[in-house]
Amino acid sequence: MELNLLTWILALLPVLVVLILMLGFKWGGSRAGAAGWIAAVLIAWLFFAAGPRLIAYTQAKAVLLSLDVLYIIWTALLLYHTADEAGAVRMIGVSLPRLTADRTMQGLLIGWLFASFLQGMGGFGVPVAVAAPLLVGLGFNPVQAVVMACIGHGWAVNYGSLATSFQTLMAVTGLPGELLAPDSAWLLGLSAYVCGAIVALVAGGWRGLLRSLPAVLVLGSVMAFSQYALAVNRLW
């Protein structure tokens, strides 16, 4: 089938169905996901001429891909909960703000560095669930805390959760990690600076951002180059 604007829109529709139902109608993920799956099957059958055999094959492939991803997710969550039960996560979260009395730097340490660390070892909402309450405890209002925690770890998603997203990317595209890793690593490395700058802006305003800009550049460089080195050396 020829690829054009219509086929592109049709292929995008199942994703839009899920987003509209979750964001617009406040459906839960399971209901919205089921509706998106039904939409995908109907579109494949009615518009892309996919027969029962092809649809069954794609569903089986999707299940196998999901099991591969779930294996990584369960391992990552086991690692996080083990560290959490040992008190390591709470200890890190409480100790980091003691390094500085500067409000903006405290926001960076918890909302950017600590949240990124949590994304790397756990992910799946853990950075926000852990970092946001710590930020509120430091005196930030709840909106600031959630925004900093959500944005601060955004750059680390691809290689976070023990590289779950990156493994999924390889599985779905069929491309080798050696080909995908360099470009994704440096693009996300640049995003690390942006995430840090936004967290500093939310925490301390423009003055806080300008005052903490050297720290953002130094810490962002350490994280970005470390991620790139690990990615290109296949440590995912």
Each model region followed by its residue ranges:
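Interfacial loop-to-helix junctions that mark the boundaries of transmembrane helices
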Residues: 1-7, 26-32, 56-67, 178-186, ...
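Short, amphipathic, aromatic/basic-enriched membrane-interface segments that mark the entry/exit
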Residues: 1-7, 94-102, 117-119, 207-217
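Hydrophobic alpha-helical transmembrane segments
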Residues: 8-12, 34, 105-109, 182, ...
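Hydrophobic mid-bilayer segments of alpha-helices in multi-pass membrane transport proteins
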Residues: 10-19, 27-49, 70-76, 216
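Alpha-helical transmembrane segments of multipass membrane proteins
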Residues: 14, 18, 36-43, 119, ...
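Membrane-embedded alpha-helical segments and adjacent helix-loop junctions characteristic
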Residues: 59-138
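Hydrophobic transmembrane alpha-helices that form the pore/transport pathway of multi-pass ion
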Residues: 106-193, 204-210
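Transmembrane helix-loop junctions at the membrane interface of multipass transporters and ion channels
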Residues: 201, 221-236
